[in-house]
Amino acid sequence: MSFNCYSKTPKEASLKSLTGKVVYKNGAPAELALVYIKQISKNTYTDENGNFIFSDIPAGKYTVFIKAYETNGITVEVDLTKKSDHLTIVLENNESTTLDNVTITSKSKGKVIKEKGFSVAIANTQKLAIQNLQSTEILGRTAGVKIRQSGGLGSHTHFNLNGLSGNSVRVFIDGIPIRNYGESFSLSSIPPAMIERIETYKGVLPAELTEDALGGGINIILKKSIDTHLSASYSYGSFNTHQVNIDGGYRNPITNFNIDVSTFLNSTDNNYEVWGDNVYVINPNTGKIKYVRAERFHDKYKSKGIKTNIGYTSIKWADEITLGLIISDMENDIQTGPVMDIVYGNRKSKRTSKMLSFKYRKKDIVIDGLSLNTFTSFSHTNRTVIDTVPYMYSWLGKIIRDNNGDPVNWQSNGGEAGDATLAENKEINIANRTGLYYQLHPQHKIGLHYFYNRFTRDIDDPLRPQAERDLTDTRYLTKQIISYSYESNFFTKKLKTNLFYKQYKQDVKLSDPKKAGQEIVATTYKKDISHNGYGAAISFAITPKITLLTSAEKALRMPGISELLGNTSDNIQPTYTLLPETSTNFNLGFLLGTYTTKKHHFNIETNFFIRDIKNLITRGISGSISDTYGFENLGKVKSTGYDLELKYNYNNRLFITSNFSNFNARYNLRYDEFGSEYIYYKDRLRNAPYLTANTYVEYKFNDFIKKNSKLSINYNFGYTHQFYRNWESLASKGKAYIPTQTLHDLGISYTAPNNKTSLSFNAKNITDKQVFDNWAMQKPGRSFYLKLTYRPLF
């Protein structure tokens, strides 16, 4: 450890600063290492260059605690009585800990996760939090991940992961399925500043994420601070978009009591321009079609939420015990049906959600080596759909009228998407995830994991006949998953293995009113599902810089809530006959690096995969005359492909991350039940992008204008190759496909010397290209955003 000191002016004598750099022995910066000053309860994390800074510290002597992932941490005494200091701390590139020379040896958390053998990508949101980016945009730059959105901010979002999408890819927040949080608290609404990192597991999920998933999962790890802190940000941009985030917390360094509060607000008109084959007006007198360039006129979106945690950490009887509360709500206008030909002018939905949670975590509980963590949540969600006006609208925002000047209706006494409705769904979700681990030996660990989820939905609509309302029963869905895991390591941790076995059980029960002649009768549906699955993940460090990763799983996913029970606000019809999806998943990949040549640093990651799927659950086709859609099983699908990612760093100034993904998912069932060959046998999956690439370039200027200030300029390029909207064999030439899309984004960020204030500007889709997704739904064109971030305490 070295100390580089400099003096302050007399005016600043009572306040000092502590700066430093944490690097690995090979020269690579140590990112996200914790640096904590105990006496004043302040902490920070190192940036991507390994640098940290504390400003305006009262003169005195301090104890600085430095902790890297999966180490006990080290303590350094610093004297700031007379002058400021600069620390240089060097970390080795392995997991052992050496305190004698104030040198710790560790790996980043991301690398530790990857070296367990799973195919996983880690997206660090913290270093991009000062930019005006959505969390979905950051995740979408990950190799093998394609974000599917049906519009602008707040629109329906799902994820395509190595060719599998929708609910085949499970999404978690801190290991709990995201559906328990309500749709108003999702990756689309949570700002990056509230997220520490996003873990993307491709194909094979570890046992501790006890869920049924066919194509992998995305685990959003929310930021957790152990100090007193306060930060706020505000951004404004195109389409009248406002976004606010405030994050504050207090920690008592004596009792270890802490409280954290985070809040967010998103608001936008989403009035961007759309044009093309699906944007037109019809002359009521001649019936002629005129294609127009129009603004979306009924697509406002607003969401807000508050998240509070209160509890203790690092006390005798608990490593962590926390009570949490999340309250959020969302309002959004609905501009279109499932396709852009269907234009709405009055339909809207509202959602509110409240979630109470309890978390407990303790190592060496009862006996040494036994660890327990448990998380329980109770959530209540209200979902309301308002659709009572039957008028047809054109893309010019005007009511369509007939020859007599009277409004044209979708249907008499109906709404825009069918029967008039004020439907209200009241949903209750109870969930518990518990993990019990026992370290049998330094090389062997066993685990037992349990997940319980009880979902109920009560449906009511005051506009429906009373007899029908009386017969509409509560929907029940109960899911239980038990998994067992065994982890081991051999040859001084060069070989690591992870074996697991999972048991799935799901029960569904409901009663629906149906017409039987002139009467309305109740039809009861009940179905129980029981299955099992198993898998393994293995990693082997061939050399310190070459690691082989392989994983395989017999995976299963049971039909989800919206797929089975429908969702009125998203135009989804129930499909009670869906079968579970099953798949045999296999991954083979390599981690190469870090390779260092003078000031140049390289990392390469690659993964090859196979997915052999039966009964894939996918969205059915929605025609222009249909306002709703359901889900269906596809007999057999086989997907193969690969991901490749390259990271380059020059002198901790120039950073380049480039990735390429290609998969080949084909319909693999040749004959139907009558022996006839499917016309789309061996076709690519419809509405599925299969070739994507992304490149992010950033250059940083340190000490820009003033000492300790930072300026960064960044550019992002995104490429999506054309893909068919429907089956290739059914598509007409020149139509029914989503064209090749290229996106160019620019950004610039400036951080003041005290590290408290940052200002960023982002320009997205600067060439104003048409961008389509989700069955040819057009996304925003060129847009500009400005964001101010202020951190008075950090």
Predicted regions and their residues:
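Short, acidic, small-residue-rich periplasmic hinge/interaction motif at the N-terminus
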Residues: 25, 34-36, 67-71, 81-129
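Short acidic/polar hinge/loop motifs at secondary-structure boundaries
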Residues: 55, 176-203
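A beta-strand signature from Gram-negative outer-membrane beta-barrel systems
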Residues: 89, 192-231
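Extracytoplasmic beta-strand/coil segments of soluble accessory domains associated
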Residues: 136-177
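Gram-negative outer-membrane beta-barrel transporters
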Residues: 504, 603, 607-612, 630-726
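Membrane-embedded beta-barrel scaffold of Gram-negative outer-membrane proteins
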Residues: 549-553, 580-640, 661, 667
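C-terminal beta-signal and adjacent terminal beta-strands/loops
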Residues: 556, 614-615, 713-743, 748-794
